[in-house]
Amino acid sequence: MKSNKLMALGIVFSIAVLIVIGTIAYSIINDKKDKGNEMFAYSTQQSLGKDDAPVKVVEFGDFKCPACRTWDVTVLPRLKEEYIDKGKVQLYFINFPFIGKDSDLGAAAGEAIYKQDKDSFWIFYDEIYQNQKKDTEEWITEDLLLSIVKEKLPKVDVEQFKKDLHSKDIKEKVSKDSDRAQKLKVQGAPSVYVNGNLANPDFDSMKKAIDKELKK
């Protein structure tokens, strides 16, 4: 009888310990989410991948930035294949328009497109980099943007895009992204964060940072 009571107490104690551990783990996970939301406002940003992916990667970029184009061509495809498509990583893009006046126009275009169709933004993301010229030139024009929308983005309504491109809401969103970059003291583009931690943007460095987070 005594041994049965001890066994029952042991089971109760074990369950209590598991509950405490689970509560702590849940708290840690939510603390990370809260930290990320505070730093990056995940829910307001362009995203690629599953919402429940355990690792959040944030890219601050400018469509006029040559290094950002290189990142799009060399790093993103591998990141997508090895992590995003497998549900391990969700990628967020945050505007950091710092090179020229037309950087803001490119950022606004991305926001206006994403507002209509999320997948179309990532097509635009590739297309505008393919059209990239010297960063000293003001090459992001409304004509270029409209040609991309008309020729490459069938899910985006052209007239609505024109209205949104210069709308107050879109301008405020781009401005908030710029403010966020300043608060984080972003020094250049692409600047990449892995679960809130600044990482080198080359694939090997990102892979190490991501794998480290996946092991936690």
Curated annotation (Swiss-Prot):
Keyword terms: Disulfide bond, Oxidoreductase, Redox-active center, Signal
UniProt similarity note: Belongs to the thioredoxin family. DsbA subfamily.
GO molecular function: oxidoreductase activity
Cystine residue pairs: 65-68
The protein's role, per its UniProt record: May be required for disulfide bond formation in some proteins.
Keyword set includes Signal: yes
Native organism: Bacillus cereus (strain ATCC 14579 / DSM 31 / CCUG 7414 / JCM 2152 / NBRC 15305 / NCIMB 9373 / NCTC 2599 / NRRL B-3711)
Signal peptide positions on this chain: 1-25
Name of protein: Probable disulfide bond formation protein D
